[in-house]
Amino acid sequence: MAKQLLLLLLLFIVHGVESAPPPHSCDPSNPTTKLYQFCRTDLPIGKRARDLVSRLTIDEKISQLVNTAPGIPRLGVPAYEWWSEALHGVAYAGPGIRFNGTVKAATSFPQVILTAASFDSYEWFRIAQVIGKEARGVYNAGQANGMTFWAPNINIFRDPRWGRGQETPGEDPMMTGTYAVAYVRGLQGDSFDGRKTLSNHLQASACCKHFTAYDLDRWKGITRYVFNAQVSLADLAETYQPPFKKCIEEGRASGIMCAYNRVNGIPSCADPNLLTRTARGQWAFRGYITSDCDAVSIIYDAQGYAKSPEDAVADVLKAGMDVNCGSYLQKHTKSALQQKKVSETDIDRALLNLFSVRIRLGLFNGDPTKLPYGNISPNEVCSPAHQALALDAARNGIVLLKNNLKLLPFSKRSVSSLAVIGPNAHVVKTLLGNYAGPPCKTVTPLDALRSYVKNAVYHQGCDSVACSNAAIDQAVAIAKNADHVVLIMGLDQTQEKEDFDRVDLSLPGKQQELITSVANAAKKPVVLVLICGGPVDISFAANNNKIGSIIWAGYPGEAGGIAISEIIFGDHNPGGRLPVTWYPQSFVNIQMTDMRMRSATGYPGRTYKFYKGPKVYEFGHGLSYSAYSYRFKTLAETNLYLNQSKAQTNSDSVRYTLVSEMGKEGCDVAKTKVTVEVENQGEMAGKHPVLMFARHERGGEDGKRAEKQLVGFKSIVLSNGEKAEMEFEIGLCEHLSRANEFGVMVLEEGKYFLTVGDSELPLIVNV
């Protein structure tokens, strides 16, 4: 009996812990909270935040300027953790989330670079919706000390060697900005079209990072902590800044993270032009700005930009930064104040932004579980619907790079034996990429393939992904006896990750030798599956007829193994398209520190927009088991007249107007619509992304103008033989403009060409 009572008591204690409400302020059962204006939900958020800040002592104020903000018991304000991560699912990284209670896992979606390959912005939105909902579910379970998530990463994947390129949506600024908007709206609880569903209340807070021109971590001894990105005004305006502008203006993100690196000599977190004049002034940002972790300390310690710790504090607070990931502001703000390098007003400004976001999250409105989003149960985390979306995301992102003689899909009836070879075939962790959380469940590619061919034989092939040692003879012996061979190779987080950039684009170690040897020995052409984030030079495989099919699977998340096997055996028709250019190994001769996008003498440029060199695979490349055709049907206006009285002529004798001169009203009407007919001419139904590009008649001539630029993309599901019409809206200011050498966006007169696949349509712009 005593044991039974003890068990009941333990169950009660556990249940009590799990049922405890998450940390919050302004408990209505506390009579003192009625005296505080910051607890009154009928008052404007700004007024509530000002009231709270006014009640703090200077020491309390300073304590709140770091990511791990302590509680203020006398006011009933609990501790708060600003740092949580949710790049492609609620993650381990950051101290804000714990998976040690009711919730022990979260849906782990594909790494962003693969999700982007679907070119489906509504799917991106749905993924972020799920992440936001699961984040709130974890918080409601009492397993989170904050609801601010430092995602998405919307830096441009400028160089294929970048270890964090896997975290981004790719190399195109327009696409990256579109991803940012979809992610922010989904996570924060808005609708897909941007309507706020619950006034000013946030489901969770998104933070677009890393502001700005951050795309080098650690390359040949040069680190992000000291790197000074020399960026032209044109590249800043046309490539690096647009995703952040879109994130703020259209996504209405509640957070921004300033980067480690300097841009043209100035640390990002200490740049008032960047943080205050641009983000808050020009783009009307209303949220908080955090530093990357220890990005304040390096301004003095590593970069030597500031002459003292107090100067570093002054630099960032006066620039417009609000919270420091790290302890630097907690240690040095008091002395900076005493030395009159900062004022209490500078501190108050930061705190108003910080507490405003916490109020918007509902953390000063009483028990959050009784408020909007309070009904999101921990049981919704890892729900069947969420896991199904993770599988869909992997299916839709995977790219079929090569499929000679229609080797794929395999017939489920005719494959009697299968050899599965490679270091990435049976490792769960590799599927997840970085910034991942504990997945709901996982199936490796090997296990998924064995659901189709029970007696599939497996050999790792290499001692690890680094493949310094390869068991080539054993792998060859297995391949010789199999009906078909699938090689699952690529990279993992030992080869590309945060704080680690690659120095070449080849597959690691003896992987190429293993692949070639197995392909030569196999009875039939083999299938090569690449699990990796960044591009690799697989020219040897692309040009080898004994390697019949190549699949790029990114880091496909918890359901990636299933998605890969479904594509190989024809239960899903692949439709993903590359969101980055795949360069040859010779690209490593270009200095990674060279930030120029445009080509120049002896320099081929970067990304599909400006690159003039050889490619392994182009941006947007992706095959299917079906064939699709495109035909332009209608264009609302083939000649557009802007009638700009202030038109000018440039050195190329091309008339142009400034986009700023046209203004919002002018740009709103300078649009046209175009309809494209898409037909599935194959035998399988499929989901197909349609990409529309535009180019100026003089595009790419002198390096000033892009070769072409993406102006729209949509995804459509078509049955075999089915046709459908898709409408695209082309905004001249947004889609056809370019930056001049002064970083000013201009719209040039002349003939433009809209292209979808091999179809092309002229559009004439008259300034």
Swiss-Prot record:
The active site is at 292. Gene3D superfamilies: Glycoside hydrolase family 3 C-terminal domain (3.40.50.1700), Glycoside hydrolase, family 3, N-terminal domain (3.20.20.300), Immunoglobulins (2.60.40.10). Its EC number is 3.2.1.-. Pfam families: Fn3-like, Glyco_hydro_3, Glyco_hydro_3_C. The keyword Secreted applies. GO terms for molecular function: xylan 1,4-beta-xylosidase activity. It is found in: Secreted, Extracellular space, Extracellular matrix. It comes from the Eukaryota. Keywords: Extracellular matrix, Glycoprotein, Glycosidase, Hydrolase, Secreted, Signal. The keyword Phosphoprotein does not apply. Residues 1-19 form the signal peptide. It is an enzyme of class 3 (hydrolase). GO terms for biological process: xylan catabolic process. PANTHER family: BETA-D-XYLOSIDASE 5-RELATED, SUGAR HYDROLASE-RELATED. Belongs to the glycosyl hydrolase 3 family. This is Probable beta-D-xylosidase 7. It comes from Arabidopsis thaliana. The lineage of its organism: Eukaryota, Viridiplantae, Streptophyta, Embryophyta, Tracheophyta. The gene is BXL7.
